[in-house]
Regions:
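Flexible, surface-exposed loop/linker segments and immediately adjacent secondary-structure boundaries
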Residues: 1-101, 105-116, 145, 151-152
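Low-complexity, repeat-rich tail regions
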Residues: 118-345
Length: 345
């Protein structure tokens, strides 16, 4: 299903897909119509979107569709698209890079660095063209956001292709550990905090049960890497630097086991049936409970020895016998996406 983003008159918002940052200036309406390893395709029906394409691999496609045309980035660069539905126009601005614009009948036109063209209708009629002379307030805001990303400390330790890496800078600190290499310590003020405790579970196809973290920095550490406890502190361990990290819905193990349905189970002190889980430690194997290729499994479990490894015994996980790391919830709260999960007493 498409992801839709609505922006009000004075609002600005930011989306990331791989190496590309999309920023909207209201009022705007944007649908993400395709997002996979090779394609980021969005549809802008009104308003303004800026696209910063940091890297473009062979076979990769970044496309912005409007009611009048389609814009495809030919190389890394900075692009801006403005749609006026009442005038039936799309303005294409290329601050750097180069883009090909396609009309309804297959017509095409190239827009190069510092060029700006206003296209009328679906046949690539040109209403106005020229060289870019100045940047407005939105362009300046985009440039400031790009500068922050350029200076990101977290980008030294994880790939920019990892969604959510930008939030790590403001909410924690990086360090080097002799056992794990680069680790990230979140700034935590909750006394009983543990990974995968403050948030909720949601059923998301095709992954199945997926962890949705409450923390603004929670996406990357919930879906990539592993967790360790170094002294009294929790540390996120991203693992070996990979150009394209592999997503997982939640890198946890459940007490009692389980699959795409909640077949795992424990008995809570109240007599209710419940679910319990804990984070995987560095080097521990995660087995997808949805269909996944051997290559996906290898890339997901790329710690140390690159050879295939069998799934470990259910009682061999490091955090399984450490109650402070285990989180529990009654089944009705788990299935209902309730945030009231807790540590066992």
């Amino acid at each position: 299903a498409a992801v839709e983003e609505q922006v009000t008159k004075i609002a600005r918002t930011e989306l990331h897909g791989g190496w590309t940052a999309l920023r909207l200036h209201g009022p705007s309406s944007l649908d993400v119509t395709r997002l996979d390893d090779d394609t980021l395709q969005v549809a802008l029906t009104e308003g303004t979107v800026s696209a910063r394409v940091r890297e473009l691999q062979p076979g990769e496609r970044i496309e912005i569709d409007t009611p009048q045309l389609a814009v495809v980035a030919d190389q890394p660069g900075e692009y801006r698209i403005d749609v006026d539905p009442r005038a039936d126009t799309t303005r294409v601005t290329v601050h750097s890079g180069s883009a090909t614009v396609y009309g309804e009948a297959g017509q095409s036109s190239t827009v190069g660095t510092r060029q700006q063209i206003v296209f009328l209708g679906r046949a690539l009629g040109v209403a106005q063209s020229g060289q870019l002379a100045w940047r407005d307030g939105f362009d300046q805001w985009v440039a400031s956001r790009d500068a922050l990303e350029d200076q990101s400390r977290s980008a030294r330790y994880v790939s920019r292709d990892m969604p959510g890496y930008q939030q790590l800078d403001a909410y924690g600190e990086w360090a080097q550990d002799p056992s794990y290499g680069s680790v990230w310590y979140p700034s935590i003020t909750i006394s009983d905090w543990a990974p995968y405790r403050y948030g909720h579970w949601a059923w998301i196809e095709p992954w199945g049960w997926t962890w949705v973290d409450d923390a603004p920095w929670g996406f990357a550490p919930s879906h990539y890497g592993r967790w360790a406890q170094i002294g009294p502190r929790w540390a996120w361990v991203p693992g070996p630097l990979a150009p394209r990290p592999v997503y997982a819905p939640a890198l946890v193990a459940f007490v009692g086991g389980g699959s795409g349905s909640t077949s795992w189970g424990i008995s809570l002190g109240s007599g209710l049936a419940g679910a319990a889980w804990f984070p995987l430690a560095p080097g521990e194997y995660w087995e997808p409970y949805y269909h996944a290729s051997p290559r996906y499994r290898r890339r997901l479990n790329h710690w140390g020895d690159a050879r295939d490894r069998a799934r470990p015994p259910a009682d061999s996980f490091y955090f399984q016998r450490r109650p402070h790391a285990i989180t529990v919830a009654p089944h009705d709260q788990f299935d209902g996406g309730d945030r009231r999960s807790r540590r066992p007493r």
